[in-house]
Amino acid sequence: YYAQDFFDENKITVENQALGGMSSRTFYTRLWPDVRKGIQKGDWVIISIGHNDNGPYDSGRARASIPGIGKDTLNVTIKETGVKETVYTYGEYLRKYINDCRAVGANPILMSLTPRDAYDENGKIVRVNKTFGLWARQVAEQENVPFVDLNEISAAKLDKYGPWKEKYHFYTDHIHTSRFGAMMNARSAAEGIAESKDPKLALLQAM
């Protein structure tokens, strides 16, 4: 939400295709086919996903991806439905999004996850720079696409606010943000794009 507030509305239209509860796997299999139909040449596609990539592979919500960025696969049968599915790594799902965007001439951008309301032993917001953030960065480097460390940018802001202010940026589940948190993350994403040294973002930076 609110990303449109940080771009020139005369130059760019922002469409938010996110849906709560999706993982890199379930968004790709369930929602991406329709989203992909609307992507056109020259579009910019921001990909930031992974909060729900844990859990069971073959039961319940069955939305987990395999950790990492390798080429590992897992063939599963969903217990509740009997549907068979091949599960890929988190990084491989990111590559699928990237390849699909490039196939129609669109410009993918990878961003690390928005931070959770969780603290380390020093009272700082926990980063994902050893898991999903690292994997997104690695895939971006491998595929030569822009990467914005949204997790770090927003977490640094929350660290400055302190716990008494941070609580106003999240709901009680410690994951979903309030209006204030959503605005902060949108601003962080825009700042990450604006301050990037990646020449591939030069055109978007002008918008």
Regions found by a protein language model. Give the residues of each.
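A short beta-strand-loop structural module common to alpha/beta enzyme folds
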Residues: N10-S23
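Alpha-helical cap/lid subdomain in secreted, periplasmic
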Residues: P33-R179, M183, S188-Q205
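Generic structural hydrophobic/aromatic packing signal, biased to beta-strands
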Residues: A3, V14-Q17, A182
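N-terminal post-signal-peptidase region of extra-cytosolic proteins
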Residues: S23-D34
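Short catalytic helix/loop segments, enriched in acidic residues and glycine
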Residues: Y1-E9
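Short, conserved aromatic-histidine micro-motifs
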Residues: K11, L204-M207
